[in-house]
Each structure stands twice: as C-alpha cells, then as structure tokens.
Amino acid sequence: MEKQIDDVLTYKIIGCAMKVHNTLGNGFQEVIYQRCLVIELDKIGLEYLREEEMPIYYDNIQVGTRRADFIIANQVLVELKAMVKLEDVHLAQGLNYLTAYQIEKGLLINFGATSLEVKRLYRKH
C-alpha cells in the first residue's frame, strides 16, 4: 500500500513539472523552472522544502554541504536541471543526494530538452 501512495505522489510531482514545461518550453535557466514548480506544487497543496541544506561528512568530519532543489512531503527528493541532455554525472548527483538525505526515492527532472525528461531514482542500500 505504501508503494501505491508513493506512486501517487510522484505522479503528482511529474504532473506539475509537465504543466510547467508545457507552458514555458525549454530554454530558461533552472531557477525559473524552480519558481514555476513552486507555484504548481502550491496549487495542489503539496508540502515541500526548497534548497534544504545537508552537511556532507567524510570520516565523521564535515567536509561541505549540498542543497537538494526540493524534498516533497518528506518522501521524494526532486533535483531539477535545465540541460540539453542529462549525463551520468547528473544521475550520480541525484543518487548521492538520496544517500545524504536518507530518502528512498527521487526524481531527476530535466526542463532543458524539447520534451520533459524524468528519471526515477532509488536509494541503494
């Protein structure tokens, strides 16, 4: 049952992203898509954290921080891009964020291509 609820959540997020991409198309900076996605998430009442900072540790020493674009309903990490094409480094970044934030599922959403590109990410154990 939990998987079904989670799928409903990811479909809602993807639906919001599709609305933004259908309205704006590609060619804008990532921050523009972030701001528009906020508007769409607010319209449907999804709770989210934006640009939530997380410390990164190595050998129990903090070596830096990272910021995920969105954490939605404390269940789905969403990383946005505005690139012509997603590369392996973007997938690796999303997977690393899932580990750092200890979140099981994520979405990598690329607004930069002619068609919206969405990759589902799952944390490795």
Question: What function would you assign to each model-found segment?
Answer:
Residues 46, 61, 75-76, 114:
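Well-ordered beta-strand scaffold positions
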Residues 28, 42-43, 62, 91-94, ...:
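Nucleic-acid endonuclease domains
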Residues 25, 68-86, 97:
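Conserved catalytic cores of phosphodiester-cleaving nucleases, focusing on short active-site segments
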Residues 49, 69-71, 110:
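Well-ordered beta-strand positions
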Residues 44-60:
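A short acidic/basic microdomain associated with nuclease active sites
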